[in-house]
A protein has these predicted regions:
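Core catalytic alpha/beta fold that binds nucleotide/phospho-ligands
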Residues: 1-254
Length: 254
């Protein structure tokens, strides 16, 4: 495909990110990318210049290790979304922009992304992807978490593993059970990434205790988090086509 096609990837990412900017609090930022616009890429082929110029040498080397197309596209799309999200963050806090190929977004020992070789700290970063979309969140707080999840019937099959009757009863529209279950899942995944990233426990440590509808397609879920320095946290939720996006943040720096 032509450079114009890949330019559409960045243009659509800009549009989607602007559309869902309300999910980010205070000085935080969010980015959302459509990975279908990268479908022409193949792991063994040379990365087009328009995309390659966004990656550092370290990231380019990391990308070369992915031989499975789906994982290749998700990793690349996630990094491109995160770098755009960081660009938005710098603009929000009135800092000079950085060339995206001058710093790396790597993963720590728990798999959580972080910025390497940049003085723009403290901040936290989270990345998620699901069925052709990637999402990123950058926050000035100690931690943050974002999750994007497609609404599918799989949620009913695994519901007992991540939720209970009390949480499901908080919703007053049982006709939307798949959506409701996906909201609970996304909320708990976002909390895990933000507050429980270094723990083996996942869903059992987070209990949804309150759900408040804030708009036609937006909600706030209040969660009790066991074993966290922030035992009570809020997850902002929005629907996006047949997807759910959930975002949360941890404590502020002292």
């Amino acid at each position: 495909m032509s450079a114009n096609h890949h330019q559409q990837f960045f243009q659509k990412m800009k549009e989607l990110s602007s559309q869902y900017h309300f999910l980010a609090t205070n000085k935080a930022t969010i980015a959302l990318a459509d990975l279908s616009l990268l479908n022409d890429l193949r792991p063994k082929n040379k990365l087009p210049a328009l995309l390659a110029q966004k990656l550092s040498t370290t990231e380019t080397q990391k990308l070369a290790h992915f031989t499975y197309k789906k994982r290749y596209t998700e990793w690349l799309g996630g990094r491109l979304a995160a770098k755009y999200c960081f660009e938005l963050f710098l603009g929000k806090v009135n800092k000079q922009p950085l060339a995206p190929n001058t710093f790396s977004i790597l993963a720590d020992e728990h798999g959580r992304p972080y910025l390497e070789k940049t003085t723009y700290r403290p901040l936290s970063l989270s990345i998620s992807h699901s069925k052709g979309y990637a999402a990123a969140y950058v926050s000035p707080k100690q931690s943050c978490g974002i999750d994007i999840q497609q609404i599918t019937s799989k949620m009913e099959v695994v519901a007992e593993k991540f939720t209970n009757h009390s949480e499901k009863a908080l919703f007053h529209d049982p006709k939307n059970q798949l959506r409701n279950l996906t909201m609970i899942w996304a909320a708990k995944e976002a909390v895990k990434k933000s507050l429980l990233h270094d723990q083996s426990i996942t869903f059992s440590a987070t209990n949804v205790i309150e759900i408040k509808k804030t708009g036609s397609n937006t909600w706030k879920l209040q969660c009790n988090v066991i074993g966290s320095p922030l035992p009570l946290t809020t997850v902002k939720i929005a629907t996006f086509n047949d997807f759910i996006i959930g975002c949360t943040e941890g404590e502020s720096y002292a």
